């Protein structure tokens, strides 16, 4: 159950490729994909594929005023940190932020939070939070790689 669904060497992106991955997740794990993230080149390739079929490109409004492409009501968002030629199909309900504690100020050896920077009329302090984003059901996610970018 720790291994996500992976398809490599996809080539040209299409709605069929995306739907096959979604169907596999639903049939094997009961996971409902609600967020798709990909590289900018993959997003352009997906737009190009939709335009080739003379279809209207569905755009949806996300929280915060952002707009995204849509695949069957699922937002398709590009991210600059996503590897080239890669698309992730995620169920965001399977992710949680786990933290050791809430935000806190680091104290020095003398118990002070605010410290003067040496030889300057400037003070500094450090605010920290030790947390990590954890996926509780990796098998409910999918990765498509080797997609030809536009």
Predicted regions and their residues:
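Sequence/fold signature of self-assembling virion shell proteins
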Residues: 1-23, 31, 47-150
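Beta-edge loop/turn motif
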Residues: 33-42
